[in-house]
Structure formats: structure tokens, C-alpha cells
Swiss-Prot record:
Keyword Nucleus in annotation: yes
Compartment(s) of residence: Nucleus; Cytoplasm
Role of this protein: May play a role in erythroid cell differentiation.
One GO-annotated biological process of the protein: erythrocyte differentiation
Keywords noted in UniProt: Cytoplasm, Nucleus
Protein's UniProt keywords contain NADP: no
Pfam families in the cross-refs: TPD
Organism of derivation: Xenopus laevis (African clawed frog)
Cellular component GO terms held in the UniProt record: cytoplasm; nucleus
Protein name: CDAN1-interacting nuclease 1
InterPro entries assigned: CDIN1
Primary subcellular site in the record, as a coarse category: nucleus
Amino acid sequence: MRLSKAQYDEIALFISTLRPTRQCMKRLKERFPCQSQSTLLSIFSQEYQKMIKRTHAKHHTPEAVEMYYARYLNEVARDPKVPILLELANEVDFSPALMARTVLERFLQDHDGQPPTKPVLSSMLRDPSLIPDPVLANQVHLCIINDCFNGPLVDGIKHAIGHEHEVLLRQKLKEHNLAFLDEDQLRLKGYDKTPDVILEVPVAVDGHVIHWIESKASFGDEASHKTYLHDQFWSYWNRFGPGLVIYWYGFIEDLDCNRERGILLKDGFPETLVMLGSCMAQTDEHGQHTKNCLNETHQETES
């Protein structure tokens, strides 16, 4: 789903008025009924992550950490069954999973006499039963399962969704008899940074030849797309030539501005492909990657 910048800004502005609860998605869908649930959820998640980054520092000052830890100890001494950390996170407008991480790290510093390593901390957040204090273990568990946008549970879901769309991309390519190499095959060939697939025979999409396809199970907003361009897409272009990025949950239409330079954006598998029967790589006078292609055949794809 392609959105104009004005449409995206309207959604982002409304999101800024919502708290990150399960009920917020119902309100968001009611406000923007024409947008898909997946698109709205992806945009909400991205906007929430931006807010977390903006406010991260104030929640991690020594004073804030000591205040959160003292509040936890005082409240849990009164009634260990009350979800203290979850309530505290909501009170100070902080991610429950990050609140749990902050207090757990402070607890382990007292318990072990030194700050925990990141692997130890991460393993306890993934499996709270590893936490030596059963009361804190339960408090951390409640934070993890009630955080809709952060934490190991959410990370696992995002990873699964990303993998699901990579599988979908490979299925689509196989349905259209397009030979390709995936990331695992490319790593075996010694490539360290690769797109999800490289086409063994390039195809044309909307009149542009592509050699690779990258799958993104997210919405393409300005911040994420700028980062991907810098960290991934231009590197792929330099190494493999022009390519296609699929933002399965849509993108801001103004971002599709690098087609002539060799990076196309789509919100799904292309509806029409031009199969290139015989291609010879060329480089034009400006150093741009081009293809001289013969024996073209058109293939319509199913939506």
C-alpha cells in the first residue's frame, strides 16, 4: 500500500496521541478504516520505536535507575503479587520490556556484585525462570508478555514474520520459473552482505532491469528507508547492479525516487515481469549499470 506523505503524517500524528496498548490498534483502525491492519501496525511500531529512542536517555540516568529500583523494592515488599514493574512502566511512559531489563540489570548488580554481561541479561529476559529471584522473575515475565512493541517475544514474532515473507518471495519466484540464489547460497560463495535473492537471469519491472530482490516485512517510512539505503541497498547496487525492494506493508510513495539510479520500490510481488532471454552487461558513460537485452517475453503475475 503506497501512501502519500500527507496520509502518512496524518497517521503518525494520530499515533502520537495513543498509548501502546492492544486497544490502540482498534482505535487506529477505526480512524483509518481504508488502511490495512498490517500497515497500521507496522507504522505504529516504527513510531513507537522512534519515541523510545528519543526518551531512552532520561530513563537510563543513574538517578532514574535508582528511583525505579527503589520503587520496585518498596512496592514488592508490600504486595509481591501486584505487577509493580508493569504499572511503573505505564506511569512513566516507558516500554515495559525495557523497564524489566533496567530493573533486572540493577538487581543482578546487587546480587552478583558486578553488572551482568549482555548475553546473561538477554537470556534471562528470554527465559525469566533463569532469574534467581522468583518474584522478580514473575514481574519480568508480566512485562515481557504485555509489551506489544518491545522485548524478546516481539523480536521473535518480527523475525518469524520476516522469514515468512522471505519464503513467500522464494515461492513467487519458483512459481514463475525464475532461477535465483538465496542468502544461504550466496554466503557459501563467500558473500558477506547480500540481498535476500539474486536472480540468475535478470528481469525487467516497469521498464527497469533488476538483478536482485530484497524483502522487507515492514512499512517503508523515511527514517527506515534512509537507513536501509545507506546500510544495504546502495551496497547491493554497487556489487550486483540494479534491484527491487519489496515493502510488503507499503511505503511512502515519494521514497520511490531512485528508479533511474537502479533501486525500485514495490508493495508486493510485481504484477508484470519482462523475462530477458539474452542479456549482456554494459556500463554507460556515467558509470551506470545497464543491460542490452534480446528476446524479451512478457509474463503476467498473479496478484
